[in-house]
């Protein structure tokens, strides 16, 4: 969400009167505010990657090494986003040595054990491995709204027999976004065919004699690469983190703390949500803030929320994943089965 908000305004960045680029912050907050208003979550949390390396970086020096350096404006934005989250009384989760994906994987499993229905709003196909009858993906459509993906949907999409095969699929085909090598020379189509035939990487590697020609040679020569890629692609579900539901209960925002932050950032449209007694501290409408106001109206036209499932009377936990800075990911909303989508740019499922 942070990256997408930033690049949505890349041609006409949102600049406040101090010359600070607030595009990423504003796009994030607008989507979150709209989400909270319409969904009315019971539980919520936001998780970030740690500042230091994770176990994947320690195991593979080139993990995500191909990614371009994070724009300075986004780096500047992240601490302010965290300040806003704290003022909104939204817990921030972060575990040293583990990616936010692993935090979500662990929370999803623990929440499921506690009787929650878990929803993960994400574009990341890796999350397919976490899907169960009680854990679903909400994938934003590039046309707006969401597509809810359960076990059968994941299997149908990739021609798999079980959604857990997503791990082996990534182990074979690799993942260029994370610099996971996979088996060189084996793409998605071939990887799917191999899993349809053998069921798993382990069974494939135990029966390479059934392969022919160049494919047999590729697989036999890259056994270690395949197994290591599967390790890198596996989302951990054993992070040392408790699922403390009471601590994640959604609370009202602290306007005494939030309003000054909105004023400082010149988020005038968001400040209108504050109680009248707090919102009276107005900001002078400079030429810059007039431009910002127009951009806010434009973004309002982009922000959409659609429900892709019927309301459930049971407890619900939803998790949204989106990339932010410092190799971090803003990932977790724990909420009911409606999720906000901010279609900053067309997104295709990869």
Language-model segments: residues:
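Noncatalytic, basic helical substrate-engagement surface that gates or grips nucleic-acid strands
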Residues: 1-121, 125-152, 225-228, 234-242, ...
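Non-catalytic nucleic-acid-binding/docking modules located in mid-to-C-terminal regions
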Residues: 42-45, 88-90, 113, 132-136, ...
């Amino acid at each position: 969400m942070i990256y997408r908000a930033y690049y949505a305004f890349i041609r006409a960045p949102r600049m406040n009167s101090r010359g600070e680029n607030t595009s990423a912050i504003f796009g994030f907050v607008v989507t979150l505010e709209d989400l909270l208003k319409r969904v009315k979550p019971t539980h919520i949390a936001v998780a970030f990657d740690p500042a230091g390396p994770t176990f994947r970086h320690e195991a593979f020096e080139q993990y995500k090494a191909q990614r371009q350096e994070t724009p300075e404006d986004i780096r500047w934005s992240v601490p302010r986003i965290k300040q806003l989250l704290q003022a909104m009384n939204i817990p921030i989760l972060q575990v040293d040595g583990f990616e936010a994906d692993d935090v979500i994987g662990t929370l999803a499993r623990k929440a499921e054990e506690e009787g929650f229905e878990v929803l993960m709003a994400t574009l990341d196909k890796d999350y397919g491995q976490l899907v169960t009858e009680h854990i679903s993906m909400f994938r934003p459509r590039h046309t707006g709204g969401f597509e809810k993906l359960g076990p059968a949907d994941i299997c149908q999409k990739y021609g798999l027999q079980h959604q857990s095969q997503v791990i082996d699929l990534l182990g074979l085909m690799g993942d260029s976004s994370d610099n996971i090598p996979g088996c060189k020379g084996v793409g998605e189509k071939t990887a799917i065919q191999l899993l349809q035939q053998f069921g798993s990487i382990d069974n494939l590697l135990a029966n390479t004699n059934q392969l022919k020609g160049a494919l047999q040679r590729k697989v036999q020569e890259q056994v270690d690469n395949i197994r290591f890629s599967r390790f890198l692609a596996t989302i951990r579900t054993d992070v040392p983190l408790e699922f403390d539901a009471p601590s994640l209960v959604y609370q009202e925002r602290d306007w005494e703390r939030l309003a000054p932050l909105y004023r400082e950032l010149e988020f005038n449209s968001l400040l209108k949500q504050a109680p009248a007694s707090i919102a009276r501290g107005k900001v002078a409408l400079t030429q810059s803030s007039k431009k910002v106001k127009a951009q806010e109206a434009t973004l309002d036209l982009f922000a959409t929320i659609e429900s892709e499932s019927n309301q459930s009377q049971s407890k619900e936990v939803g998790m949204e994943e989106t990339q932010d800075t410092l190799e971090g990911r803003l990932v977790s909303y724990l909420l009911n089965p409606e999720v906000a989508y901010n279609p900053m740019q067309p997104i295709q499922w990869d």
